[in-house]
Amino acid sequence: VSDENSGAVSAHEIELYPVVSVIAGEWIVRYDQGLEQKLRHTRLQALPNETGGAIVGITDFKNKTIILVDVLPEPIDSKSSPAFFVRGEEGQKEALERVQQLTARVVDYVGEWHSHPQGFSAKASNEDDNLIKKLHQKMSVEGLPAVMLIVAENDINIIVR
C-alpha cells in the first residue's frame, strides 16, 4: 500500500485460500474459498430472509474465464424476505467506482448473487431464470457475460449467460 502524499510504502498481508473452479456453460468460473466463506456467512446472518448483492471480478475473454473477486455489501434500500431478495441501488455506484479505482479498472461488475432460504437448494427458480435473462440482455450490449451465483445451505450454483 502506498501513500500518494508522502510516498511512503507499507506492507499489507492477506490470507490466501484454495481456488475453486466451476464450469458454467462455455465459461470457467474461479473464486477462492475465502469468498465462499464470506457468502455463506452473509447468508447465515440474513436468515430467515434471503440476501445478496453485486459481484465484482475479472472477465478473461481469451481464456473464457471469469474470476470472482468479491461481492459488494447489500445496499440498505434492498428488499428481502424468506421468499425473495431485490437488491437496492444506494451506494452501489460509489462502491463500484472505488473497486475500479483501486484496481485500475481491472476488476469490474460481473453479475449478481443471492441466497436461498433453509430447506431449498441453490437450483435457479423461475424468477432467477428471468433475472439472469434480463441481466444477460443488459450486459451483452457491452459484449459481456452475466454471472448469477446462488448460495443455499448445502450448495452453490453458478450460472453464466
Q: What annotation goes with each model-predicted range?
A:
Residues V1-Y109, P117-R161:
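Conserved beta-strand-loop surface patch within small alpha/beta domains used
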